[in-house]
Amino acid sequence: MQLLLIHSDYIEYETKKQTPVAEKIEESLKSCRLEEALTAFMAVESVDEANPEETIEKTVFEIEKVATQVKTDRIMLYPYAHLSSDLSSPKVAVKVFKGIETALSGKYEVKRAPFGWYKAFSISCKGHPLSELSRSIRPEGTQRAAGKVEAGKEKEEVVSEALKAEDTAKSYWRILTPDGELREIENFDLTPYPKLQQFVDYEISKSRAVERAPPHVELMRRLELADYEPGSDSGNMRYYPKGRLIKALLENYVLDVATDFGAMEVETPIMYDMNHPTLKKYLDRFPARQYSIESDKRQMFLRFAACFGQFLMNHDMTISYRNLPLRMIEMTRYSFRKEQRGELVGLRRLRAFTMPDMHSLCEDMDQAVDQFKKQYDLCIDVLENIGIHIKDYEVAIRFTKDFYESNKELIVNMARTVNKPVLVEMWDTRFFYFVLKFEFNFVDALAKASALSTVQIDVENAERYDISYVNADGKLERPTVLHCSPSGAIERCIYALLEKAAMETEEGKVPMLPVWLSPTQVRIVPISEKHVAFAEEVSQKLDCRVDIDDRDLSIGKKVREAGREWVPYVVVIGDKEIEDGTINVTIRAESEQKKPKKVQITPEELNDRIKGEIAGKPYRKLPLSKHLSGRPKFV
């Protein structure tokens, strides 16, 4: 079932001509107008033939949920075959439409446009954030293959109960302001906050499908950072030397920050027994699709987070209350999630990714809340130092109603800290293992959002994994657990930096990466061969990643290529520089698109400037030949 829901000022139709599959209708149904209504455009698909009753039930649930959100008691059901290219038989379609009509009629004023007729229609969409929503509904236990329903012919995809619950969980969306107001979205003016508007639309629509490649895909290839690997599964990438360098620097940085925060680095397996009693329960509480493989007649799954290994390790440890909060971190290279193929694109959404995963065992909820606050601030600092600032992302806070009532000040302070409105999702009932979580979400050039940093308060897994600590009285107690990824997936950080640069380019700014992450920090461009020796001397005075463009190209082309590679500092060496010992430097961060900023300084002054910019950050050597003439092309 494909469903398009439009909250409308009015919807009206008039039948014109019947098709060979048209249902017989009374004269009164040949035209209709319904005002202040939720219009449900629907296409019943071949996959729905396997279980029409389930399709009816799920569709009714979705329509009722949206009708409640937009506060209407009028519904127009409108068959609309153009929503799908894989339609069910007319007989099944009519059965489903009538079933939905019957199920809704007890609570709503329902009108149904006739099936199989050509119709003229007019509709006026209200235009608020909830006024246009789409849903894709499928009965369980079916597979789509070559446009047909194939029952039991393909290996069943492993989908957790939590992922199923995520599709049906009833939640309330609100905007929380820095002064503590919790506002309904329809009653909050999002106009001054265009990125928040895009994020709200993205979250509520739940549409993750890729319509076109975002700008970072072209950039990751042109900058020779990463690329698709056709020899692997979709969503598994190859990283060229420059991309691997950036990944390694980000990994090292996040690990350093976590270690300074008090976390112990560990390493755990990437696969686990799907039938392990404890792990099986957790699988059903985590909203993710898994890769599964068979090994020695056991069904295994590839981890989608470090939780499994760290919690099993916690179970075997002897922990005192004096050790709390106890923190462990792992840089998972890799974690695996069987994301749907149509959602995969570039570095935004992958099936194999690198995730810094930190868990904290806390003495009780009070200590967990205290740690949550500190880790919220930690995540802000981590992204800031990566080059992703508060203005660059939108905050989502998700919690149960009970937790909110008991911890309003904590939640309001989160909005106050970032000093801007945030999106809130609240559940009446807890469907998942957490009672509170937040994410920092980057909204890209195509208005698609991706979660970066996150922290969650987990109230289930200490019990599930039998994790305990010895309290001050010598008795065993269960800790409260925090899950934290200080940066989010490393690949997503690169994606966000590239997308941010692309958007800044559209605004007339000069794109670049932070200096500490730039593969080449200084490029020396000798004007001719006779200047190469002095270029070598200058390079020896710079404690950074420096290369020399010694190719037989014009000076103009060398400088342009350095610009296309986003090199932060470009040094041109000619006769003047050899004579007076200074260097001509173009500073990218201070340049405009048609007005480069150039200064004449000494190599020592340039070195001091760069050392100041990269102070406190990890460092790695240049991953390629120092001389551009010795480098291969990867793309």
Curated annotation (Swiss-Prot):
GO terms for molecular function: ATP binding; threonine-tRNA ligase activity; tRNA binding; zinc ion binding. Signal peptide: none annotated. GO terms for biological process: threonyl-tRNA aminoacylation. InterPro entries: aa-tRNA-synt_IIb, aa-tRNA-synth_II, aa-tRNA-synth_II/BPL/LPL, Anticodon-bd, Anticodon-bd_dom_sf, DTD-like_sf, Thr-tRNA-ligase_IIa, Threonyl-tRNA_syn_edit_dom_arc. The keyword RNA-binding applies. Residues 1-144 are annotated as: Editing domain. Binds 1 zinc ion per subunit. Its main location: cytoplasm. It comes from the Archaea. The N-terminal domain is an archaea-specific tRNA-editing domain that hydrolyzes incorrectly charged L-seryl-tRNA(Thr). Catalysis of tRNA editing is performed by the charged tRNA itself. Belongs to the class-II aminoacyl-tRNA synthetase family. This is Threonine--tRNA ligase. It comes from Methanosarcina barkeri (strain Fusaro / DSM 804).
